[in-house]
Amino acid sequence: MAVPEGAQPAVDDLDFDGALDIFWPVAGTSGAGLLAAGLPTRTPITFGALEGASGPMLVREIDAPDPYGALALEVLQIQNGELIAQSPDVSTLAPNKIGQAIYLKFIGKKDNRQGVGAVVEVRSGNVYRRIYWRGRSEVVGIGQQKWADVIRVTWPNGVVQQELDVEEGVAIMLDNPSFGEQPEGLIGSCPFLYTWNGETFEFISDVLGITPLGLPLAPGMLVPPDHDEYVLVRGDQLKVDANGELVMQFTEELREVTYLDRVRLDVIDHPEGTDIYPNERFAFPPFPEPHVHTVSRIAQPKKVTGSDGRDWTAELQGNDMHHPAPFERLAGQFLGLAEPHWLELEFDPADLAGAKLIRLVATGWFFWSDASVNVAAAGTPGIDFVPPTLEVQNADGQWVPAGPPLGFPAGKTKTMVIDITSMIPKGNPRFRISSTLELYWDSILLAVCDDDAEFKTTSLEPVSSDLWSRGFSEPIMPDRQDMPLFFDWSKTTEEPRWDQHPGLYTRYGAVDELLETIDDRYVIMGSGDALTLHFDATALPAVPEGYTRDYLVFLDGWAKDRDPNTYEALEVEPLPFHGMSGYPYRADESFPDSAEMQAWRKEWNTRPSHRWIVPLSTERETQWVREAISKLKASERGGR
C-alpha cells in the first residue's frame, strides 16, 4: 500500500506494539494506513467510515479523567466544517495483538515548563521507542510486555534520569514526581580537588571556576576566562601518607571537559596565629594579581541586618556552615539567581582604630548559574546578574556603590580578601553588600592588620601522576538550602548522569611531562576521569618553631561545560590556548600548529570519548559493550 499523492499522513502507535504506524484520510473512509510501517512485518489497515471528512488527520491521546484507566488514541478530522473525533478500533484490524501502554507526562523546571526538547527513551524487551518531547503527554506502547524495563529522560540541559520496571498503565509524573520532574541539581561548575587527610581523600572545593570557556553573561557578551588559580588547602586537610608523600586527586565529575596545563604545590610555613589566603575570586579584568594575604588580627561585625529585616549577626561571626539567606532564591530557568538583596554590616570603630590597612575577608559559596540562566536573565526584565557590590551611605543618606563589584568566591567554600581601606569610613564603619546572586556567606570579617607577616614557601613538583578512569563520586545531599553540595570520594555512584564530550582526550597513565610548564601541551580530561598526583614530602624542610604549615595548589587551565547556550560547548574542540583573545577565539586566530604541538596531539590525544550511559536501543547497546570491552583491554588497568 502506498501513501496517496497529496495525502497528509499522521504517525503514531495505534496498536501499542511499540512500532510507529502511519495513516491518512482517504475518500469514503476515515483512514487507511500501515501498522509497523518501518518494519518488514508492516500490515495495511483501513478504519471507520466518515463521509465528508477532509483535511489533515491529527492524532491525540484521550484525556481520560482517570489516568489509570484504559489508554487510547483518537483521530481528529474536519467534517462539514466541524472538528470531529473518532477512536479507531484497531482491535478489529489486529485481533489479540493490541499491546500495553504507559502514560507519560513530564514537567520541566530548569529549561522550560513543558520539557520541550527532552529526549525520552522507552525500552521494554525488544521494543524501543525514542521520542523528542513536544511538551504534551504521550501514550507509549510497549507491546505484549507488562512493564517497561527502563524509561530514560535526557533533559534539554543534558541531565539524564531513568526509572526501572515501570508497569503498564502507570501515569509517570502522576505516580512518581521525583522522576517526572526535571532535577535542579549541579550540572556544571568546574573540576574537583580532593586531598589525603590521613584517613581518606577529603573534598576541598571545585577549582578553576574562574576559567569558564564560552560562558555568556548575555547574548554576545562572554566572560573572559582567568586561566590560573591558587587553591588554599589547610594543613589538617593534607597529610603525609605512609609512603612519605602528599597525595591529591583532581577529578572531572560534572558535564564538562577540563584542559589542565600546570600543577604545582606551594608549601607555606607561616607564624602561628596568622592565617593565609590566596588573592583569588571570580572577577572581571583586571584579574587579581598573584599574592598571599596574611591575616593576624580581625574585627567581627557587631551587628548584621538583612534586607529581609532579620538579624544575621550570629551567622557571620565565623566559619561554621551557617549562612544568612536574606533572599528568595529564583528556581527553574533562573537557578543561581535571587531577588535583589543586601546585608548591612556595622563594626565597632574601636576595632579599626590605628589600622593602616583594612581588608574585607569574606568566606562563602555561590550556587553556580550557567549559560542558559544568564541568557534567560538577560532577556527577562527585572531579572539581573549583579555580583556583590559594597555600598556606603552618601551625604543624603542614600546607599551608593563605593567602587566596582567585588567579585565572589569561585567555589565552595572559599575566601576572598579585598583592600577596602579607602571605601569605608573608619569613624562609622557601616556598609552593605548587595547582590542578586544565590550566594551564601559563612563569615564576613575585617582584617585590621598589616599584610606583612613573614612566611616561607617551598614549591614541590609532582613526582608522579596517573590519569585514569574512575567514575563519579556519590554526592552528599545537603539538608538545608544554604548548604553546598559536597562529594564522598569513598563512594562512586552506579548511575552516571552524563557522557563525555565527543572528541579526543589524553591517554591514560603518567602525564608528568604535560604538567611541568605552561605551554598549551595540557591534559584533556572528561567526565569520570581522575588525575592522581604525588608530591615528595621528604624533600620538605621541618616546620620552624612557632610556625604552622598550610598549602596552596597552583593550577593553570580551563574548563568548559556542555550547556546548550555555552559557546562551542558540544565537543572537546576547539582547543583553548594561552595566546587567544577570548573563547571562542577570533576567525584570524587558531590553535598553535607547530611541529611540537602536532607531536603532542599525535602522541597524547589518542583516547576517544567514553559513553558512561548504556544505550537503550539493542543495536547501540551491543556497540557500547564492544567498545567498553575494547577500552578495558587497552587500558590494562587493574586493582583500582
Where are these predicted regions, by residue range?
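Gly/Ser/Thr/Pro-enriched helix-cap/hinge segments flanking short amphipathic alpha-helices
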Residues: 55, 66-72, 79-317, 324-358, ...
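Short beta-strand and adjacent turn/loop elements
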Residues: 360-368, 410-414, 437-439, 524-527, ...
